[in-house]
Design a protein with these regions (language model features):
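Hydrophobic alpha-helical transmembrane segments
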Residues: 26-34, 248-265
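Transmembrane alpha-helix boundary/anchor motif
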Residues: 33, 41, 101, 176, ...
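Hydrophobic, glycine- and aromatic-enriched re-entrant/interface helices and adjoining loop segments
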Residues: 70-87, 163-257, 275-283
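Hydrophobic alpha-helical segments of membrane proteins
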Residues: 136, 140, 144, 220, ...
Length: 374
């Protein structure tokens, strides 16, 4: 779909119709290699690398803010120049690095996971630090996804619900404040509430996205025959590729994609339920939530159910770092699923009972249940 959605923009910008498709293919190859390798390596071997990986990701997210190093696009500095591969976005790599680290950290502190001061406060502080870096990059969409990654791992690891409610409420107020303070975010909110009020201005992207989806009908106009991609819909090959999918393949195509993500989500959480240790439970939950939530946000944005967030559609949108990192995360998830207990649906109740017991908040001072492997 990247080839079809980007061909017009690629030719006008780079005089090559396959400029973006070629780079996406290279990143896809890198991603599939990472998927294969990580699906074969025991996921528990990632634990010793978790702290170093998180620190490296944070440093890269900090370095990208340096004017001489980072690349600025549309007023946001989030990328490094990757030469013939296009650009490299550290925050995408950070999703996987922080997912591994937070699952490791929660398992390490599982003996007092319900303690507000010993666990929740440090957890919230780590999340706040990551969000601060993302806000400096002006990346609200990735910030929302990062919250989902952290919170899902915390909940799967046995965190208290009231702590998560408090955290989400505080972050919600923070995001509202940021929206009110930034004029371009207010413009997005206004366009979301009534895109037809200014269809040639702030509501242009949302309006064209809806037109694209509507013109697809049941079966679409055919692959490669989209009209919106010819300069009408901005970011047609990136954040709004779902609208091009809807235009070219119709309701049938978009429904199949949604069902595909639903299937992935169910299988991912099933892998989390059957993971042999708390680290695997948290890691599988965070990876599944990351990809599923990102897809949900993107589709909601394209259909104007939510304001524009700038979140890509996993596996479909153009973006080499995002694609390679997501495929690598799928490799980790496959390894967790392969390591899980039970090989038939009949074991699902047993797996759920074990997961439910693991989520019970340990009494402070009790000895932590050991993981299968360190």
């Amino acid at each position: 779909m990247v080839t079809s959605a980007s061909v017009a923009f690629a030719y006008t910008q780079h005089q090559s119709a396959f400029y973006y498709a070629e780079r996406q293919a290279i990143w896809m190859a890198i991603g599939f290699v990472a998927l294969f390798v990580l699906s074969r390596i025991d996921y528990r071997r990632l634990r010793p690398l978790a702290p170093a990986g998180a620190v490296a990701a944070a440093l890269l997210m900090l370095l990208v803010l340096v004017p001489q190093l980072g690349v600025t696009v549309n007023g946001a500095r989030r990328w490094f120049d990757a030469g013939p591969l296009g650009t490299f976005q550290p925050s995408e790599l950070g999703k996987l690095a922080f997912a591994v680290y937070i699952a490791h950290w929660i398992d390490k502190h599982s003996s007092y996971i319900g303690d507000f001061q010993k666990t929740f406060v440090p957890f919230a502080a780590m999340l706040a630090g990551v969000l601060a870096l993302l806000m400096l990059e002006r990346d609200l969409g990735t910030s929302v996804v990062m919250v989902a990654i952290f919170v899902s791992a915390y909940w799967a690891g046995g965190g208290r619900v009231r702590h998560m409610v408090l955290l989400v409420a505080a972050l919600g107020l923070g995001f509202v404040a940021l929206t009110l303070l930034e004029s371009y975010r207010m413009a997005r909110l206004t366009a979301f509430l009534n895109p037809l009020a200014d269809p040639l201005g702030t509501g242009f992207q949302a309006t064209q996205s809806i037109y694209g989806l509507a013109s697809g009908g049941w079966f679409g106009v055919g692959i490669g025959h989209s009209i919106e991609k010819y300069g009408w819909l901005p970011e047609a090959h990136t954040d709004f590729i779902f609208a091009i999918v809807g235009e070219e393949t119709g309701l049938v195509g978009t429904t199949l994609i949604m069902l595909g993500f639903l299937f992935f989500t169910l299988r991912g959480y099933r892998a989390s339920l059957r993971a042999p240790d708390r680290f695997g439970v948290g890691l599988a939950a965070s990876i599944t939530t990351w990809i599923a939530f990102e897809a949900l946000l993107n589709m909601a944005t394209v259909t104007n159910t939510l304001p524009i967030t700038g979140v890509p559609l996993p596996f479909f949108s153009y973006g080499g770092t995002a694609l390679a990192t997501t495929l690598a995360a799928v490799g980790v998830l496959l390894n967790i699923a392969r390591s899980g207990t039970g090989s038939s649906l009949g074991r699902s109740d047993e797996a759920f009972d074990r997961w439910r017991r693991n989520r019970r908040t340990p009494v402070p001072g009790n000895r932590r249940r050991p993981s299968v492997s360190r």
